[in-house]
C-alpha cells in the first residue's frame, strides 16, 4: 500500500511539479504586496497632521478636488481611515481600478494609487498563468491548468503526509529536524521531508481555499460543507445617484456632497472604534477593527443625511461572510502580521518541494541506471 501511494505521489508530481513551483512562488511574492506598495509610495498613502488640525468636511474636500482637477470629476465614494496620518481615498467615476489620494487636512491632491506592474504580473501568473479570462466569471486555459494543478497539489500534500508518517520513534526524531553538515543530498532530502511536513497544513489551507476561484462546482461544494450557499449572497444595488440632488447637469442631477458631512458625523459618534468609514451615494460602510474583514452598512436619507438603519455584520448570513473568510485564510491575513509571515514561508517551502523532489527522483533514477549497468555487462 505504501509503495502504491509513493508511486501516486511520484506520477502526479513529475508532470505538474514546475507549475506548482510557479503558483507557490508567485503567491509568496503577493503576501506583502500592499505593505510593499505603500512603503514605496509614502506620499500617496501617508499625510502629515498639523498640530491641532481637524479633517475637512467631505463636501469641502470634493470642492478642493474640483478646483485642482476639474468640476466635471464625479466622486463616487470617499474613505476616511481611523489613522489620522493615513490619506483620504476617493473613488472617481471612470477610474475603477485606482483611487485618488487626498490630504484630508488641506484638500491637496497627492496622486493616484496604483499597483506596481510587478504585482499585477504576479497576480496574473498566480491565478491564470498569464492567460486571464476575457471577462469576469469566464474561463481560460491558464485558469483551468492552475485549477487542475491545485487539485493535484492537494493530493500530493495528502500522499506526502502518508509517506512521511514514521514507523519508529527514531524515525520520528529524524523527520522532525533538518540535518546540516551531512552533505547536500541529505540536506535536500530533509528540506523535502521535514519542511514539507511543517508547511503541509498551511499549503493545504491555501490550496483548498484557492480552488474556490478556479471551479464553480468546487465553490458550491466548499460553501455547502460550511453550511452556506454560494449563490445566496444578498445583492446590493449599485446606485450611482441618490434622490438628494441639486442642479441638473447634462440631463442628470448632481449629488449634494454636503449630505456626507452629516452622515460622517453620525457614524463617528456611533462608532468609537473603526478601521475606516467609506461614504457612498446611498449608503456608508464602516470597516470594523480586526484582521478578518468585517463591515457594517448604514443606510441614510439622501436629502438630509440622517441614518435610517444599519445592516450589521454580526447579523449577516454566513454565505455573505464566506468570501471574506476564504480570502483571509488564503492570504494569511486572518491572524495579522504573524500569520502572513508564516504563510509567506509556507509558500516558499511549497516552491522548494517540487524542486527537491525532482532532485531526489533524478538521483534515484541515476543510481538505478548505474546499478543496472554492471549486471547488463556481466551477461
Predicted regions and their residues:
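Conserved histidines in hydrophobic membrane contexts and catalytic metal-binding motifs
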Residues: 1-379
Amino acid at each position: 500500500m505504501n509503495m502504491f501511494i509513493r508511486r501516486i505521489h511520484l506520477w502526479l508530481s513529475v508532470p505538474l511539479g514546475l507549475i506548482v513551483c510557479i503558483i507557490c512562488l508567485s503567491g509568496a511574492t503577493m503576501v506583502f504586496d500592499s505593505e510593499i506598495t505603500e512603503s514605496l509610495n509614502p506620499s500617496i498613502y501617508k499625510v502629515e497632521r498639523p498640530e491641532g488640525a481637524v479633517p475637512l468636511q467631505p463636501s469641502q474636500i470634493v470642492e478642493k478636488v474640483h478646483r485642482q482637477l476639474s468640476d466635471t470629476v464625479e466622486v463616487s465614494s470617499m474613505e476616511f481611515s481611523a489613522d489620522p496620518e493615513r490619506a483620504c481615498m476617493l473613488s472617481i467615476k471612470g477610474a475603477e481600478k485606482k483611487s485618488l489620494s487626498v490630504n484630508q487636512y488641506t484638500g491637496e491632491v497627492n496622486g493616484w494609487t496604483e499597483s506596481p506592474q510587478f504585482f499585477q504580473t504576479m497576480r496574473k501568473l498566480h491565478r491564470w498563468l498569464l492567460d486571464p479570462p476575457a471577462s469576469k466569471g469566464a474561463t481560460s486555459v491558464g485558469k483551468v491548468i492552475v485549477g487542475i494543478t491545485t487539485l493535484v497539489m492537494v493530493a500530493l500534500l495528502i500522499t506526502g503526509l502518508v509517506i512521511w508518517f514514521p514507523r519508529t520513534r527514531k524515525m520520528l526524531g529524524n523527520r522532525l529536524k533538518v540535518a546540516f553538515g551531512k552533505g547536500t543530498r541529505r540536506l535536500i532530502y530533509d528540506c523535502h521531508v521535514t519542511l514539507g511536513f511543517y508547511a503541509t497544513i498551511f499549503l493545504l489551507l491555501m490550496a483548498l481555499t484557492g480552488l474556490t476561484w478556479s471551479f464553480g462546482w468546487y465553490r458550491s461544494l466548499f460553501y455547502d460543507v460550511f453550511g452556506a450557499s454560494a449563490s445566496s449572497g444578498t445583492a446590493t444595488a449599485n446606485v450611482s445617484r441618490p434622490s438628494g440632488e441639486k442642479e441638473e447637469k447634462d440631463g442628470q442631477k448632481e449629488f449634494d456632497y454636503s449630505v456626507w458631512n452629516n452622515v460622517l458625523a453620525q457614524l463617528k459618534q456611533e462608532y468609537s472604534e473603526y478601521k475606516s468609514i467609506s461614504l457612498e451615494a446611498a449608503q456608508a460602510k464602516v470597516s470594523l477593527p480586526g484582521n478578518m474583514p468585517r463591515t457594517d452598512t448604514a443606510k441614510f436619507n439622501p436629502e438630509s443625511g440622517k441614518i435610517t438603519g444599519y445592516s450589521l455584520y454580526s447579523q449577516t448570513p454566513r454565505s455573505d461572510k464566506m468570501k471574506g473568510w476564504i480570502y483571509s485564510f488564503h492570504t494569511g491575513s486572518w491572524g495579522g502580521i504573524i500569520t502572513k509571515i508564516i504563510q509567506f514561508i509556507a509558500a516558499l517551502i511549497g516552491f522548494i518541494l517540487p524542486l527537491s523532489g525532482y532532485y531526489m527522483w533524478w538521483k534515484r533514477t541515476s543510481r538505478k541506471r548505474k546499478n543496472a549497468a554492471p549486471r547488463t555487462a556481466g551477461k
